[in-house]
Curated annotation (Swiss-Prot):
PANTHER family: UPF0297 PROTEIN YRZL
Species classification: Bacteria, Bacillati, Bacillota, Bacilli, Lactobacillales
Family: Belongs to the UPF0297 family.
Name under which the protein is recorded: UPF0297 protein SAG2091
Pfam families the record matches: IreB
Top-level taxon of origin: Bacteria
InterPro entries for this protein: IreB
Transmembrane region(s): none
Length: 88
């Protein structure tokens, strides 16, 4: 199956927004406590899908794996845009 030149709509369920935000915060704190650079580790996980970027410490690995990576990216983009004055 090839790519098309037409725009495709991508929409995720809004029900996980708060949960994803809370999970990212908890994972960030766990990474920080273990001495990792949390941003680098979360980006590594989101880009690769390799859970080894997130430690098992405080159940962080299982927490972040509850969500699809595209859901995490959507929440990060939404948060960034809202923080920069975009009304979504």
């Amino acid at each position: 199956m090839g790519f098309t030149d037409e725009t495709v709509r991508f929409r995720l369920d809004d029900s996980n927004k708060v949960e994803i935000s809370e999970t990212l915060t908890a994972v960030y704190r766990s990474l920080e406590e273990k001495g990792y650079n949390p941003i680098n580790q979360i980006v590594g996980y989101v880009l690769s899908g390799d859970p080894a970027y997130v430690p098992r410490y405080n159940d962080a690995r299982n927490q972040i794996r509850k969500y699809e990576r595209d859901e995490i990216v959507e929440e990060l983009v939404r948060y960034y845009l809202q923080g920069n004055g975009i009304d979504l």
